[in-house]
């Protein structure tokens, strides 16, 4: 009888010691996130429509990046400027249709990231070049309607968390560990 109680206690203890999360519809993963429609991530963000990203932003329509700005025809960016057709900002030059800048340049209706620009027309920059409707950054680049993440991204519709696989593994392990104890307890009970 004590063995049965012990095996049940082991099984429950292993289950309680496992935290599990699952994601359906869209997912957020530690450090990396990607979505179609909108997405939030710490470090890298990509979206088609709008997104918020810390450090780096991927642009397909409009986006907001901490320390960079929001761009959709016109925008205001911390330390950069406001853009509608054309703009002038300290240490940054941009025309309407094309731009050349030592650091960052942006055309009409496009966007700027730290050392990275997306341009409606054409531009030249020492760091990164991008066409209309897409952007490339030193870390992650994504076009409109798709996203690429430097680590792992959960896609819309279904999201599978690695902790779900961990939970299945723990359940199997708990069953294996408790099976011999349960079998011995049953044999002793029959005696």
UniProtKB/Swiss-Prot annotation:
Signal peptide annotation: 1-17
TM annotation in the entry: 168-188
Topology of the protein relative to the lipid bilayer: Single-pass membrane protein
Region named Disordered: 82-148
Highest rank taxon of the organism: Eukaryota
Any single Gene Ontology cellular-component annotation: membrane
Primary location group: membrane
Keywords annotated in UniProt: Membrane, Signal, Transmembrane, Transmembrane helix
Subcellular location field: Membrane
Keyword Hydrolase: no
Note: Completely overlaps YRF1-2.
Protein name per UniProt: Putative uncharacterized protein YER190C-A
Lineage: Eukaryota, Fungi, Dikarya, Ascomycota, Saccharomycotina
